[in-house]
Each structure stands twice: as structure tokens, then as C-alpha cells.
């Protein structure tokens, strides 16, 4: 974006209301809690009208939840309405494309994930985030997990595959080319004797519902998207893509502990 001015874009959820702080500081202070990137531009006289967050995934997933939490806090700090606009599709590429072609006036932000880096190399509608967007803040990290519908007697991903007793396994993610898709594809490729078919959805929430509804065998999703259904005993996590176990899930092994690739 040519001029350094703040940016935000339309769901149609409005988050309604402080003063002329640096928008970069305001967002960074509110965003230390996610695995999501807020990509935007930065302005001088700001804001004098509602700001728009374009969320690159469908409602209900971890990216959407983070956008709403950040939007609420940012609205309080800036004294202006934040409008949440979910533009899911093409693993986040549609939302990124929309923001990249919007006015660089400081009123349109993209809320996305690390999928934006994969899209730049693989998606036919991708943009170059290095030249077409200005990064504002990284929120936090939510490692990828692979989970099965309960009750599942298996305690790890290799054990689940061995007990499946079928030649083809299906797994869901929030879209083709997302980190969750590529993580699961890589891990399942390392387990012999099974063919894995990817079923893409528009958000982590939809991918989780697919496995709960028994439409697919597994779901690959950020741990933040799955924690509530795990606590409700609807989902069992078979492994986490991290060098060490997640504090809130101390009994869930890392994939490295299960004999698969050690990743973070």
C-alpha cells in the first residue's frame, strides 16, 4: 500500500465504541492473543468513521473469534465502530484479494492466518502480501491439532489409522492450502497403509462440525477452534503440531512423541 494509512473493511456485525493513538500500537496491544495476522495500512487523521475488518474465513472459526475480540477492544480505544466482514473462500485468498484492492485510506484491515504465505505461492487468485499489504501485528500462536469424533479409543494418530479398518481416510480443514491442510497431508503421508482424502471447508468451525457429524474421519484445525468441543467431550485430539505439549491439554501427545514428524 503506497501511503502509510490504517485499514479496515464489512460482516455485517458492528462493534461500537479513545483518541488519536497510533493504530499500530492500538492493534498490537489488543492482539497478543492469537495465531492470526492483522494486515493493514496506517493513517494520520484516524478514525472519523467506522473501520472495517475483513475476516478471510467464515464465521465461527478461531480467526473470526479473534477478529471480534480485537474489534471490541479496538473500538473502545479508538471510540469508533468496528465492522466485521467475513469473506471466506479459497483458503483466505478471497479476503486478501478484496483488501488489496480497497482504498489505502486506513479504514480496511485484513484478518487472516499464515495461509496468506501459502496462497502467495499456490493460489491462482493470490496477491503478494509483501508489496500489496502492510503488516500491523501478529496476535498469537495456536498450534494445529488433528482430532477425531468421540468416542475414539485411539490415543494417537498412528493408532487411529491402524484401528480404522478401511483403506481410505477423509480429513477436513478450513480450506485447501491452509496450514492445517498441509500439516495433515504431510503427517498422514508418513503413515503407511492408508490413502487420505482432503475435504476443504470455509472455516475451522465447519471442519470441526464435519467430524462431529461423522462426515469425515478427522479434522485438522487450530487448537483454539477445538477446545470448547473437546471440553464438551465431542472431539478427541490425537496429536498436536508442536515441539512440546499444550499446557491446557497435557495428556495430548505431540506428533513427534507419536513417532511422526516433529513440527512447530
Predicted regions and their residues:
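Extracytoplasmic "Venus flytrap"
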Residues: 53-66, 90, 172-179
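Bacterial N-terminal signal peptides
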Residues: 26-37
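Short helix-initiation/N-cap motifs at beta->coil->alpha
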Residues: 87-95, 141-142, 198-209, 222-225
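Hinge/capping helix and adjacent helix->loop/strand transition within the periplasmic-binding protein
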Residues: 101-107, 120-206, 255-260
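Short, well-ordered beta-strand elements
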Residues: 49-58, 82-83, 108-111, 134, ...
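C-terminal lobe and pocket-closing loops
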Residues: 141, 226-264
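Beta->alpha turn/N-cap motifs
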Residues: 111-116, 204, 221-226, 241-243
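Alpha-to-beta junction loops
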Residues: 80, 102-110, 167-169, 212-220, ...
Amino acid at each position: 500500500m503506497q501511503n502509510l494509512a490504517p485499514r479496515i473493511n464489512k460482516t455485517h456485525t458492528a462493534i461500537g465504541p479513545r483518541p488519536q493513538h497510533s493504530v499500530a500500537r492500538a492493534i498490537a496491544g489488543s492482539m497478543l492473543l492469537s495465531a492470526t495476522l492483522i494486515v493493514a495500512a496506517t493513517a494520520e487523521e484516524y478514525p472519523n468513521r467506522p473501520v472495517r475488518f475483513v475476516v478471510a474465513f467464515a464465521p465461527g472459526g478461531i480467526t473470526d473469534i479473534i477478529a471480534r475480540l480485537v474489534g471490541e477492544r479496538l473500538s473502545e480505544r479508538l471510540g469508533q465502530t468496528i465492522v466485521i466482514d467475513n469473506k471466506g473462500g479459497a483458503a483466505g485468498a478471497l479476503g486478501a484479494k478484496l483488501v488489496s484492492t480497497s482504498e489505502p485510506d486506513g479504514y480496511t484491515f485484513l484478518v487472516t492466518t499464515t495461509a496468506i504465505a501459502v496462497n502467495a505461492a499456490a493460489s491462482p487468485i493470490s496477491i503478494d502480501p509483501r508489496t500489496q499489504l502492510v503488516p500491523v501485528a501478529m496476535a498469537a500462536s495456536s498450534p494445529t491439532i488433528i482430532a477425531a469424533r468421540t468416542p475414539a479409543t485411539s490415543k494417537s494418530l498412528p493408532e487411529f489409522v491402524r484401528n480404522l479398518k478401511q483403506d481410505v481416510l477423509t480429513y477436513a480443514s478450513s480450506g485447501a492450502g491452509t496450514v492445517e491442510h498441509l500439516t495433515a497431508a504431510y503427517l498422514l503421508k508418513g503413515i503407511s497403509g492408508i490413502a487420505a482424502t482432503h475435504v476443504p471447508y470455509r472455516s475451522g468451525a465447519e471442519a470441526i462440525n464435519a467430524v462431529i457429524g461423522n462426515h469425515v474421519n478427522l479434522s485438522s484445525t487450530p487448537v483454539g477452534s477445538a477446545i470448547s468441543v473437546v471440553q464438551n467431550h465431542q472431539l478427541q485430539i490425537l496429536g498436536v503440531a508442536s515441539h512440546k505439549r499444550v499446557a491446557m491439554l497435557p495428556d495430548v501427545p505431540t506428533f513427534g512423541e507419536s513417532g511422526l514428524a516433529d513440527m512447530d
